[in-house]
C-alpha cells in the first residue's frame, strides 16, 4: 500500500532527524527581512543568512518541509497551473541542510538511502538517474564508485544557458553571493511515457522527472564574476513533496496524488461540477492552497506588491469556478477541506480559519460584481476580432474597469486559441507598470551587505549604561579601521545596552563616548548576530579596539517601554472585544506612539473602541506584574503564547506575561508593571488593506497631553458658541439647524436670481437659420446653476442652441443645451467639445445637454465668439 502525502512528509523529516538533523518548522510565506524575495520560494530561504554568514544557529544540520509560493517575480508558474502535470502556485519543499557540517559524500549517501532503502521509500534503483555539473568530478565519482550507479545513468551537464556557470546544474543565489554545483536525481517512469533523459533533445517529456536537487554551496561569487571558495562549504537540498508523492503513489501527475484528489472532489462539490477531469478543478484546487496560506501569513488582497499577486490568484480561481457553473460564492468553502487534507502542516491555517474564509469570501463577492460584465465585454471584443490577437488597449480596459488581471484575460483567450498583445497592454498601463516593478524588482548585492563575524551581547534589559569595546566599524557598508569627526558610520560593540530594532520596536538612540570622542547614535540595527550603532562621530576619532561607554537615551527608552507594554495589553483586549480571529499583522512602537495592525474585516464601532480602551486601562489600574521567562519555542506555543507577525524566532524564546491577561513571545523592552503605563488612549482607527485594521494609540504623558488638548479644544468651542461643556451638544445642534435653514433660503434666492437672469437672457438670443442661438458669459453665477438656467431658456425659446459660461476662481465652467428638434444637426457634446478645447479643457454629454470645464479664462471670449460661425455651418 502506497504512503499518503502526509506520511511521506513525516517519513522525510523522521529520516533526517535520525541522521542528527534538527527538524525546523516551515517559515512564513512572507520572507523575513529579505528585500530580494516576493515570497518564500525554496526551503533554504529561512536559512539564507546562515549560508551568508550573517546568522548562526545552535545546530549545524536541519531538515524542513517548507511551504512555498511561486507566482510573481522571477519564479512565476501561474499561467501554467492547471494545464501541466507539475506546475503549482503553492507547494511544499522537503529539504535537508548542512551548515559547514557534512558535504558531498554524506549528502549523496543520505539521499540514496532514503530513496532506495526498503525501510523508507524503496524506489527501484534501476529507475533512478542523476546529473552532475560538468566539472564536478567529485560528485561523479561518489555516484559511480560509492553508490554504484552505472555510468550511462550519470549525466554531466555543462553551461547550457549561454554564460559561464549558467547551467541547470550550477545553483546561484543571485548575481553575487553563495553558489555551487548541484546534482539532481531523476525518476524514470518507463518507456510507455514519451521523453528522454536529462540533457537529451527529448528531456522535456514526462518520462524522466526530477525529484531531488542537491546543491553544494562551495563558492562565493563576486561582483566581477570571480569565484572564491567558501571557508565552510554547505549543502542545500530540495525535493518537491507533490512530485515525490506522485512517484511513490505510482501516478504520472501531481494532481492525481491523494491530496489533490481529495481537494478536487471538494471543488467539484462546492461548484456543482461533475467532470472530475476538468482542468478548472485543478486550477482551483491549487489556488486555494496558495491563497489560504498567504492570507494566514498576513498577505491581504491589494492593488500592489504581494497583495496584488494574491488578488490575481483569487480572481483566477473565481473565474474558473464561474466556468464550472458555480452560482454563488464558493472559494472560501474550500478552506475547511484544505485544513483536513494538510494534516499537521495545516495547524497554522486552522487557527486562522475564520479570518481566511472571511477575506476570501469578501474578495470573491467584490469580484463577482464585475466578473459577469467583464466577461461579456471580453466576449464582445473577441466576437469582433478578425485576427488571432487581442489588442493591448482592450486588455488594459478590462483591467482598469473590471479588475481583470491580464493573465486572466490571457487565460480566456488561450481557451479560444487567441493571443493577447501584452506589449500593448504594458504600454497602456504605465502606472501599473511602476507597481509591477515595485512588486517584482527585488534584488540585492549580498556582498554589499554589512557582514560581521563577531556577535554582540545585548545587555539592555538590565542596563542603560555599559562599557564595551569596538569590534568593527563600517562606512558606506565597507569595513574600516578608524573614523574621524564628522564621519557617519556603523559602530559594532562586543556588548551593548542599545536595543536593535526588532519586533516592531524601534532601535535605541543615545551616545557612545570616551575621553577624546563622542559618537551620536541615531538608530540601532541588527546585522546577523551583531548590533550596529548607526550615527555620526561628533568629536575626536574612533578606531577598532577602542573602549567606549555606551549610554542609551533613558527618557526615550522609558516612553518606548510603556508603549510596547500597552501594545501587548491592547492585542489581548482586541481579542476579547472583537474575537479570537484578531491576530497581529504588523506594529510600530516608538517613543511617541504605538501603531498596531490586526486582522478584522470591518471598521470598529465607537463602542468597541471604547471597550478596548476601558479594558486596557482596567489592566493598567490592576498594576499587574510584567514577567519574562526563557523557554523552548514549542513549550511557549503550548502555553498559549502569541507570536508576532513576520518575526523569526530561535529555538529558545523569551515569553512575556502580564498577569493572567496577556502572554506573548517578545524580545522587546517593557515596563515592570502595567501600572507604570499610567493611561492609554486610542487616537485613531482605520483600514490599511482588505481585512486589516490599524489602531494608533498613546500612553503615559502622551495620553495625558491628548486629554489636555481635547479639553482645550472643547473649551474653545464652548467659548465661540457662548456656552459651556454641559450644554455644548445642544448649542452645536442649534447652530447646525440655523445654518441649514440659512443655506436653504440662500439657495432659493439663487434660483430666483437665476430665473430672472434667464428671463433677461432670452431677449439676447439671435436667429440662425430659423434656430434661436444664445451665447453668454455670466458673472457671479455658480456653475451648478447653469444647468437650471439652460432648462429654463430651452422652455422659453423653443428651437434653440444655448451656450452659457461662468468663471469662478480662474476656472471656466461651460454648458451647452440643444432642443431635441435640432439634435439631428447640432449635438451638444460636439459643440461643448469645440468650445472647451479653446479654453484648455474637455467635456462631453448627451446630444441635448453637455458640460465642460477649462483652465484658460482669458481665452473664453474668443471661444464663445466662435460658436456662431460653427453653428451656422452646421445649420446650413
Swiss-Prot record:
Presence of the UniProt keyword Nucleus in the record: no
Q: Which reaction does it catalyse?
A: tRNA(Ala) + L-alanine + ATP = L-alanyl-tRNA(Ala) + AMP + diphosphate
CDD domains with a match to the protein in the record: AlaRS_core
Under InterPro entries, the record lists:
aa-tRNA-synth_II/BPL/LPL (IPR045864), Ala-tRNA-lgiase_IIc (IPR002318), Ala-tRNA-ligase_IIc_anticod-bd (IPR018162), Ala-tRNA-synth_IIc_core (IPR018165), Ala-tRNA-synth_IIc_N (IPR018164), Ala-tRNA_ligase (IPR050058), Ala_tRNA_ligase_euk/bac (IPR023033), DHHA1_dom (IPR003156)
Q: Which residues carry this modification: N6-acetyllysine?
A: 74
> How does the cofactor bind to this protein, according to its record?
Binds 1 zinc ion per subunit.
Keyword ATP-binding in record: yes
**Looking at the record's lineage, which domain of life comes first?**
Bacteria
Q: What is its EC number?
A: 6.1.1.7
Q: What is its main location?
A: cytoplasm
Which positions are tagged coiled coil?
A: none
Listed Gene3D superfamilies: 2.40.30.130, 3.10.310.40, 3.30.54.20, 6.10.250.550, Bira Bifunctional Protein, Domain 2 (3.30.930.10), Threonyl-trna Synthetase, Chain A, domain 2 (3.30.980.10)
HAMAP family from the UniProt entry: Ala_tRNA_synth_B (MF_00036_B)
How is this protein named in the record?
A: Alanine--tRNA ligase
State the organism named in the record.
Escherichia coli (strain ATCC 8739 / DSM 1576 / NBRC 3972 / NCIMB 8545 / WDCM 00012 / Crooks)
Gene from which this protein is expressed: alaS
